[in-house]
């Protein structure tokens, strides 16, 4: 029982180390290259490609990822509080925000539909 808990803790720590390591690599790449893509996104891509190439196994990352997903709602609390503090600004800009969200979604939807149509026609 204690041995199992200790093993789970070690697996969780390894998982968190891999996730935070990918984040650190992403931030470092972003700082050295100066690209406008956030380091966290680059870190996610680093982790994704290392898992795709088989350098990192999914089971190694799963305990930490599950923990983050389980408590993800807590990460939205500061954002929600910030939005409520600036609600008047949010309300004043509601139309551009809604228009950009709907417009962006439509652009993505149409682009993916065209791409899928092209790829399916190419196979047949």
From Swiss-Prot:
GO cellular component terms given for this protein: plasma membrane
According to the record, the segments passing through the membrane are: 9-29, 35-55, 72-92, 95-115
Please state which protein family the record places this protein in. Answer: Belongs to the UPF0299 family.
Locations listed in the record = Cell inner membrane
Look up and give the organism this protein is from.
Vibrio parahaemolyticus serotype O3:K6 (strain RIMD 2210633)
Q: What is this protein called?
A: UPF0299 membrane protein VP1300
What Pfam families does the entry give?
A: LrgA
Mainly localized where? membrane
HAMAP family annotated for this entry? UPF0299 (MF_01144)
Q: Which InterPro entries match?
A: LrgA/CidA, Uncharacterised_UPF0299
- Record key words, sorted: Cell inner membrane, Cell membrane, Membrane, Transmembrane, Transmembrane helix
Topology versus the membrane = Multi-pass membrane protein
